[in-house]
Every structure is written in C-alpha cells, then in structure tokens.
C-alpha cells in the first residue's frame, strides 16, 4: 500500500483516482473532477451523528455511527469501497478533514484484507491548496484577454492555444444570455476547483502567460473568482475580428444546429427538440427589457417561425433572420461601445489566423 499522502500537487497533476467518503450533501456542494462519492454515512445518518455529537460528545456520536452503519448496510458499503480499491489500485480515499470518517473507512477496508491509503487533511486541505494555487497563478502569471464581437469564434481560438484558459468550457456555459447548454453547470466550488487544477497543470508544463476570453463576472451561474476577474480588467487585450456573414453562420452552427443536437442526444428526438426550442425562446425573453417590446416581439416571431420550419422540415435557414437582427440591433452596438472604452488596452486586432499567430508569438517572447 502507498503511504497516506499530503502531496496534493501530485494528486491533482497525476489525476489520481480518489474516493470521497463524505455524505452526498457535502459532495454535491463541491468536489474534485473524476472523484467518486462512496460515503461512510448517508445524509440522514450524518445528521443524526452530528446532532448526537453536539448533545452528548464524540464518544456517543461514534457509538451511534457504528449502530447506524452495521450489518447489511455496512457490508454493502465496504463491498463498494473494495470494488473501487481494486479498480483503482493507485487511488486514495478522503473525508472532510482526513479524520474519523476516512480513518474508519481505511480500517474497515483493512479488516476486509484491503490496504488503501487516505489523503491527510482531507477535502478541506485539498480545497485550501487549490485556492492557494489560484491565488498564486493570478499573482505571479501574466494574462492576455481575448475580446471580439459575438460570433467571431473566440472559443475556437482558445482551443488552438496551449496557454489558454477556457472559462466557458470549465463553466459549461457559452457566457451570453443564450449560453446555457443542454447539460447543467458545475457547482461554484466545482468550477473553482477545475479552474485551479487547469492552472496548476499548465504551470507545471512551464506556462506562465495565459489567454482568457473577455468575460463578465458571471459565466452563467458560475462566478469568475474575484481576484482573477479584477486582474482581467487591467490586462492587455487582443481583439478578434470577422465578417458579419461569417459570424451569423458561426452562431447558427453553435446556438441552433449544435445546441439542438446536444438536447436530442441528452433527451431524445421529440423531447430534445421541444426543450431546445423552449431554451432558445427563453434566452430571447431574458433580454426582453433590453431589446424593448417591439423589437423583442419581432425577433420572437422570427425565431418561432424558424423553429416551426426546423421541426417540420429540418431546415435551419430561417434562423438567420433573428440572428442577423439580434447581432445588428443588439449585440454589435453593445460590443462596439465596450470596445471603445477598452481601446487603450487593445494591443492587436485581426482575424483568426492573425490573432493565433500573434498570441503564439507573444507567448514565446514572454
């Protein structure tokens, strides 16, 4: 058996499999990528033990825990842990602080003939390590912010750069009012943990300059960490440009064709299309006040007609109508205003090929 470990850096850099022995309610609030929740106690059992601890102390709480998790319940849980240990011989287990729960799991596994290491300090210590990692990256590394009108393909650029940090990808959201995906977003703590691990791995690969997309503080329901967002407000910018026609086609691809396919993959043909249509109309409704009543109604009618035609024949051509209107009358004026206020920070502007070449050259020079 490997020794119990407090080398959190190695655990995250190597994507070491980990078993989380906390209760499901704790796990749902935040965990680490790829970790499996195999709790010692379920939520109700944990609550009872916690109440007992407050009223009668630790010894009574431990005794109650053993009474609640015994017999067949205990056997089923131990068997699940054994299966995990056999499937992941290089893995570790942890609880919240690396205390009684993970020690109990470790001891019961040993009683069953399985030696398995635990993470010293548990979830809390690993979470603190990742928050420190995030702080150090923001403090010590340089950042370049990639801006551009809606539909210029900023994410396409980021995916081609080894030093990019894709905040929208980590948040599973495209960042705009239309940015929700067919699958949900991570919890805030999960978002922060994934971001910190991404930064940790890139720095371990020698990357000290990062390219991030120009985002508001909120990417859907995920908050960009305050110190990172504040740092982004003063960083140099690169502005991505493309023709209006290309941008319309890209938005059609991303927000209609691909999003519809996502919903159908997740929910099936009939329900998937209905949920896709509902999501698109709701996204437009979210900016009703900013569009104004007349413009919202006009774009909504165009969108509804396009959705009906798509459902009837599979054709998506009519969607270009509302996309062109939304870009020309809403997003483009808004982004033009933002660019004017950020002009002093923009050190380069160009199309995808030019911007990629510039950012790659810039990363090699710094």
Swiss-Prot record:
Stretches assigned to the Rhodanese domain: 12-135
Reactions listed under catalytic activity: 5-methylaminomethyl-2-thiouridine(34) in tRNA + selenophosphate + (2E)-geranyl diphosphate + H2O + H(+) = 5-methylaminomethyl-2-selenouridine(34) in tRNA + (2E)-thiogeraniol + phosphate + diphosphate; 5-methylaminomethyl-2-thiouridine(34) in tRNA + (2E)-geranyl diphosphate = 5-methylaminomethyl-S-(2E)-geranyl-thiouridine(34) in tRNA + diphosphate; 5-methylaminomethyl-S-(2E)-geranyl-thiouridine(34) in tRNA + selenophosphate + H(+) = 5-methylaminomethyl-2-(Se-phospho)selenouridine(34) in tRNA + (2E)-thiogeraniol; 5-methylaminomethyl-2-(Se-phospho)selenouridine(34) in tRNA + H2O = 5-methylaminomethyl-2-selenouridine(34) in tRNA + phosphate
MF terms (GO), sorted A to Z: transferase activity, transferring alkyl or aryl (other than methyl) groups; tRNA 2-selenouridine synthase activity
InterPro entries associated with the record: Rhodanese-like_dom, Rhodanese-like_dom_sf, SelU
Entry annotation: catalytic residues: 95
GO biological process, alphabetically ordered: tRNA wobble uridine modification
EC numbers: 2.9.1.3
Keywords linked to the UniProt accession: Selenium, Transferase
Annotated PANTHER family: TRNA 2-SELENOURIDINE SYNTHASE (PTHR30401:SF0)
Family: Belongs to the SelU family.
Subunit structure: Monomer.
Task performed by this protein: Involved in the post-transcriptional modification of the uridine at the wobble position (U34) of tRNA(Lys), tRNA(Glu) and tRNA(Gln). Catalyzes the conversion of 2-thiouridine (S2U-RNA) to 2-selenouridine (Se2U-RNA). Acts in a two-step process involving geranylation of 2-thiouridine (S2U) to S-geranyl-2-thiouridine (geS2U) and subsequent selenation of the latter derivative to 2-selenouridine (Se2U) in the tRNA chain.
Protein name stated in the entry: tRNA 2-selenouridine synthase
């Amino acid at each position: 058996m490997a020794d119990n470990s407090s080398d959190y850096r190695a655990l995250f850099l190597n994507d070491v499999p980990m078993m989380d022995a906390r209760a499901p309610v704790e796990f749902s609030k935040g965990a680490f990528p790829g970790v499996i929740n195999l709790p010692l106690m379920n939520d109700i059992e944990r609550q009872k033990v916690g109440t007992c601890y407050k009223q009668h102390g630790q010894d009574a709480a431990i005794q109650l825990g053993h009474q609640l998790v015994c017999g067949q319940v205990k056997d089923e849980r131990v068997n699940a842990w054994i299966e995990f240990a056999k499937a992941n011989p290089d893995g570790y287990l942890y609880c919240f602080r690396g205390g009684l729960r993970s020690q109990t799991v470790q001891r019961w596994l040993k009683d069953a003939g399985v030696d398995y290491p635990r993470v010293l300090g548990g979830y809390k210590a690993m979470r603190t390590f990742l928050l420190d990692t995030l702080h150090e990256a923001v403090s010590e590394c340089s950042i370049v912010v990639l801006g551009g009108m809606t539909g210029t393909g900023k994410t396409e650029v980021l995916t081609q750069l080894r030093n990019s940090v894709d905040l929208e990808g980590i948040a599973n959201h495209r960042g705009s009012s239309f940015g929700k995906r067919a699958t949900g977003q991570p919890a805030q703590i999960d978002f922060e943990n994934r971001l910190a691990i991404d930064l940790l791995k890139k720095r371990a690969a020698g990357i000290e300059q990062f390219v991030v997309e120009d985002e508001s503080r909120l990417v859907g329901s995920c908050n960009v960490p305050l110190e990172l967002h504040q740092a982004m407000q003063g960083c140099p910018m690169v502005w991505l440009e493309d023709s209006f026609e290309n941008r319309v086609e890209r938005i059609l691809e991303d927000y209609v064709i691909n999003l519809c396919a996502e919903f159908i993959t997740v929910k099936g043909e009939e329900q998937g299309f209905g949920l896709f249509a509902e999501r698109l109309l709701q996204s437009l409704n979210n900016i009703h006040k900013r569009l104004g009543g007349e413009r919202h109604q006009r774009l909504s009618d165009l969108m509804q007609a396009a959705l009906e035609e798509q459902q009837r024949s599979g054709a998506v051509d009519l969607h270009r109508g509302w996309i062109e209107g939304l870009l020309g009358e809403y997003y483009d004026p808004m982004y033009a205003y933002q660019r004017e206020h950020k002009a002093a920070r923009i050190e380069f502007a160009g199309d995808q090929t030019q911007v990629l070449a510039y950012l790659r050259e810039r990363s090699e020079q710094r």
